[in-house]
Amino acid sequence: DGELITVQDEWNNTYEEGSLKTSATDWINNIGKLQKTEGYKIKVASACNLEITGRPVQIPLNIEIHEGWNIISFPVNGSMDAMQVVQPLIDAGILYKIQDEKGFSIEEWKMGWKDHIRYFNAGEGYLLQANKSGVLTINSADVKSGFYATERIEPDYFSVCYEGNGLNHMNINIVELNATHFRAGDEIAAFDGDICVGAVKLTESDLMNDVVSIPVSASEPNGENGFTEGNPIEIRGW
């Protein structure tokens, strides 16, 4: 229905309309067939649903992980505790970091591993950075039916520069929140110059944990709607 702009796999291969890069008007597929173990970045003109038909993916499912950045699928009809899924990769020294489409992460802080994703959900893909190659196994015994964690409330005062989920996020991790005298409902934002590239509204849970992670969105290839690598980031509160 004219919503799709581009699809990209973890190797930066694309499926997009030829007119974006050439004089051709047909869609050009440099990805090939979609793979059940792979996730994909999808850019659309506005919010919409993608319906995929076919036979359900059989689990247990083994997903090959290579060193560096991977985009993995979650082709399971249900939800799973995210930390439980990736714990074997942590134990094996494979996992460096994993992010959801909004940039929330599971990563190691000085005080240990912090989980800001909570649950892997049906229909989602995840960006995984690995220290070395390995295999991630998704087991059916761990699947919960249709459970979704409560989403974080969007900020009211600060408005981020991008629409949707953002792109190629960086995480700004703030510790010792209680020493700053912030309260639940207060907002913290990250700025690249005058551009708000990420913001969160603090919750009681953030204050209990004394930490918060702010996903900030990178700029698009045209240099708009996100932070520019190498630029200083300023933190503001309200």
Walk through the language-model features, giving the residues of each.
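N-terminal exported-region signature
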Residues: 1-171, 175-187, 192-238
